[in-house]
């Protein structure tokens, strides 16, 4: 959209989708862009069904548990929260009043930063769309987590050219063993099958 397209859109509607991703490892078989690719596709689908505009994706986020893997780009919690606040404030200044926040990256600190930032900007309504709450567990054979069956399946559907299933592995993780941090518990970066 050009700024003039945004001006025309705002005469009709005041809502916008703001997708978030993260640049982080997703095992040997998925790209660093997995979270953003999923968020972008979900935002596009929602836009097509509802007519809501989509803001450009925020590619970087808080990725504490995957920071040791080359290619992961991590933003500190406070820096990310302030950055999100600035973006939300800019959207408010443009006269958007309702912002739908959609993140393909679901680490708790990343989500908390987005939610806290949205509470700090007055005069906007911000809604966090948590796609992890969708009822899809009955079609999965394994518990969804990170670079797992769920994310791999979504990427195979959305961007099969970005998935290298010849590199996929089935590294077994005992979930209770890494309640504090997953940094030392997986070689491949896959948390879940």
How would you label these PLM feature ranges?
Residues 1-193:
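Extended, histidine- and acidic-residue-enriched regions that form the cofactor-binding/catalytic faces
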